[in-house]
């Protein structure tokens, strides 16, 4: 299936900026990938001494394969990029558009455990405006990949800059990393904040402060 114009534009912008997730061509269909992942997960679980003949575990390798391809890593495939509605700014909107408390669940690419958090996204309309729900969908698309939070934040920024044809975009993500919470240091209370600021959000202290410190 051919990629949408929006998907191609976003992918090209990320590649140009060196911000694309490290990926190599697979050459397999979605179902072929599921079959391969299922086979490997069966081997991994067997090496962990789990009895895959038990009715509770028998379908686990297939469940994991479907979850990886269709759900939590679906953002690796640009065929899943959301349908985007960008329209001309005929109303002349020139004040900040801000969407906050966007829920996101991603996966740490170092340990493949959960990243759980929220995003705040804002832009100053120029020539184009975007349907508000599309901002949430773009955040979700890039979250559905193995990620590091810093790259995720930048990817959302660059995607919106490319689609809206303006640098005036800002993104902030607050998240809990389960690679910190459930293993290693096992810190259950810390969280991580990352920001990506473009255009006037970076160059103008007042606009930056309005974005970063606006009351909830």
Curated annotation (Swiss-Prot):
One of its GO terms (cellular component) is cytoplasm. Keywords: GTP-binding, Hydrolase, Metal-binding, Nucleotide-binding, One-carbon metabolism, Zinc. GO terms for molecular function: GTP binding; GTP cyclohydrolase I activity; zinc ion binding. It catalyses: GTP + H2O = 7,8-dihydroneopterin 3'-triphosphate + formate + H(+). The keyword Metal-binding applies. PANTHER family: GTP CYCLOHYDROLASE 1 (PTHR11109:SF7), GTP CYCLOHYDROLASE I (PTHR11109). This is GTP cyclohydrolase 1. It comes from Shewanella amazonensis (strain ATCC BAA-1098 / SB2B). The lineage of its organism: Bacteria, Pseudomonadati, Pseudomonadota, Gammaproteobacteria, Alteromonadales.
């Amino acid at each position: 299936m051919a990629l949408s114009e929006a998907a191609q534009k976003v992918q090209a912008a990320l590649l140009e900026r060196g911000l694309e997730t490290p990926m190599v061509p697979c050459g397999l269909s979605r179902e072929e990938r599921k079959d391969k992942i299922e086979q490997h997960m069966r081997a991994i679980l067997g090496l962990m001494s789990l009895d895959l003949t038990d009715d509770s575990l028998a379908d686990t390798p297939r469940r994991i394969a479907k979850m990886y391809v269709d759900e939590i890593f679906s953002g690796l495939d640009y065929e899943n990029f959301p349908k985007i509605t960008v329209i001309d700014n005929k109303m002349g909107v020139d004040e900040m558009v801000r969407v906050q408390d966007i829920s996101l669940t991603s996966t740490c690419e170092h340990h493949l455990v959960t990243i759980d958090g929220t995003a705040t996204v804002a832009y100053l309309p120029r020539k184009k405006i975007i349907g508000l729900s599309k901002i949430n969908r773009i955040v979700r698309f890039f979250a559905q990949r193995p990620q590091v939070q810093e790259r995720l934040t930048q990817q959302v920024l660059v995607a919106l800059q490319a689609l809206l044809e303006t640098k005036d975009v800002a993104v902030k993500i607050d998240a809990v990393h389960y690679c910190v919470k459930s293993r290693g240091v096992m810190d259950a209370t810390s969280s991580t904040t990352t920001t990506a600021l473009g255009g006037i959000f970076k160059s103008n202290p007042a606009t930056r402060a309005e974005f970063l410190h606006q009351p909830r």
